[in-house]
Swiss-Prot record:
Residues 175-391 are annotated as: Domain III, AAA+ region. Residues 392-511 are annotated as: Domain IV, binds dsDNA. It comes from Pseudomonas putida (strain W619). Plays an essential role in the initiation and regulation of chromosomal replication. ATP-DnaA binds to the origin of replication (oriC) to initiate formation of the DNA replication initiation complex once per cell cycle. Binds the DnaA box (a 9 base pair repeat at the origin) and separates the double-stranded (ds)DNA. Forms a right-handed helical filament on oriC DNA; dsDNA binds to the exterior of the filament while single-stranded (ss)DNA is stabiized in the filament's interior. SUPFAM superfamilies: P-loop containing nucleoside triphosphate hydrolases, TrpR-like. This is Chromosomal replication initiator protein DnaA. Domain I is involved in oligomerization and binding regulators, domain II is flexibile and of varying length in different bacteria, domain III forms the AAA+ region, while domain IV binds dsDNA. Residues 91-174 are annotated as: Domain II. Residues 1-90 are annotated as: Domain I, interacts with DnaA modulators. The lineage of its organism: Bacteria, Pseudomonadati, Pseudomonadota, Gammaproteobacteria, Pseudomonadales. It is found in: Cytoplasm. Its main location: cytoplasm. The gene is dnaA.
Amino acid sequence: MSVELWQQCVELLRDELPAQQFNTWIRPLQVEAEGDELRVYAPNRFVLDWVNEKYLGRLLELLGENGSGIAPALSLLIGSRRSSAPRAAPNAPVSAAMAASLAQTHAQPAAAPVMAVADPVSVPTAEPAQASDMAEASSRDSYDSMADSAPAPVAPGRTEQRNVQVEGALKHTSYLNRTFTFETFVEGKSNQLARAAAWQVADNPKHGYNPLFLYGGVGLGKTHLMHAVGNHLLKKNPNAKVVYLHSERFVADMVKALQLNAINEFKRFYRSVDALLIDDIQFFARKERSQEEFFHTFNALLEGGQQVILTSDRYPKEIEGLEERLKSRFGWGLTVAVEPPELETRVAILMKKADQAKVELPHDAAFFIAQRIRSNVRELEGALKRVIAHSHFMGRDITIELIRESLKDLLALQDKLVSVDNIQRTVAEYYKIKISDLLSKRRSRSVARPRQVAMALSKELTNHSLPEIGDMFGGRDHTTVLHACRKINELKESDADIREDYKNLLRTLTT
C-alpha cells in the first residue's frame, strides 16, 4: 500500500472534519510503507488512543474505498518514522474488521482545536481554548463534552506554533499568536504598569516577577501582553520551551491523562517548560483535582526557576472556589490590574489598527468611535472593522456620517443603556442609597461622594452638557458638576477605594 493512497484518504478526511479537529489529531500523524503494510506513527499515546477510538474506522473505510477494495494492513505505533526504534501500541496491528465498531464513534469526534503546522506535535491539547463552562470530570463522556465545547478563539492564520524537541518523544508547542507583540500593543495610562511588568519579565525571565499575575475585565489586553512576553522569549531564545494555553485546556489534559493512566507524562510535559502562560485562571475555581495538580506544578516550576504568567478577570483574592494556598502563591510575585482604556488610549488604538489595515481614519472619526465605545478593546476593534467594511462596500470615505450609519444599532444600544437616569440608578444601588438622595440637597459624605461619582460618570458616558447634567441632579449649577468631575479625577489618583468604585461602576454601565 502506498503512502500516496494514505495522503489521498487523509485529504478526503480533511473535507469531512472541522479544521481544528483535523489539525489536532490527523495532521500530527506520520506514515511509512513497509511492503503491503502501512505504519502510522502518532507522536504520543494521547494522539494514538484518540485516533484509534475516533477516526481510525473512517480512515480504514476510505483506504478500502480508494484502494483495491481489500482490507488494508495497518499498524499504529508511537514515535516517528525518523526514529530508530518506534514503540508498538498494544492495539496494533489493526485490521478492517475493527472498522465497523470504531466507525460508530467517528460521528462524534472530539474537538481539541489547534492551528495547522507542517511538523507533527506531541501534546496536541496544550492550546488556547475558549472560556466555556466545562466541569471537571473523570469519565470518558465528560471528557468528550469538555473537548467538544472548546472552540479555538484564535483566528485562522494568526497562530504560529514552534516545536522544540525535548526528552524522549515529548515536544512543546507554544501556540502563541505571532501578531501579539509589544510593538503592536498600544500603551496608555490604563495599562502602563501592566505593560512595564510584562516587559520586565520578557527581558529578564526567572529573575523578575514570578509569577506575574495580570487581572482585569474582558478585552483589555491581558492576553495580548501574555503572548507578547512569550513571543519575546522565543525571539531571544528560539529553543525556549514556552507554552501558552487556556486554563480549561489544562483541566482537559489532566482528565485525559488520568483516563489513559498517563499522569506522569502529563506532569513531565507541564513541569519541563521554561515558561508556562495560563489564561483565565479563574476557571480552576471549584475544580479541586485540577487545583491540586496545578498547585504541585506551580511549585515545581517556581522551585526550578521557570517563569509563570497567569491572567484572570478579577483580583486573585476575589476568585471564589479557589484554594487559599493558591491565592497565597499567586501573590508571591507581582499582581497588576489592567484597566479599561481611557479616551486617549482608545483613540490611539483605533488609529493604530486603521494604520495596520492600511485604511485612512480621520482623527475626528476615531474620536467619535472612541467616545461611544468604552467597554473594552475587543468591542472597539469590532466597531472599527464594521466601519471599514461599510466604507469598502459602499465605496465611501470614512466620515462621522458613515460611522453613524454602520454602527447605528450599536450606538442606539449604547445610548439606551448609558443614560443619566441609568447612571443615577446604578450608583444608588452600588452605594445602597436612594436616587432621591442623589437629587437632594444633603451634603453628608455618604451622599455627596456618590453624587459626585454619578456626575463624573454622566459627563464621561453621555453627551449631555454640564448645565444639562446639573439640571438632572436636582437643578444644580454647571460649576457644581465641573467641581464634582475634577474632585473625582483627583480622588481616582489618590484614593484606591474611589478608584475601584469608579472602575466597577464604569464596567457595569458599559458592559
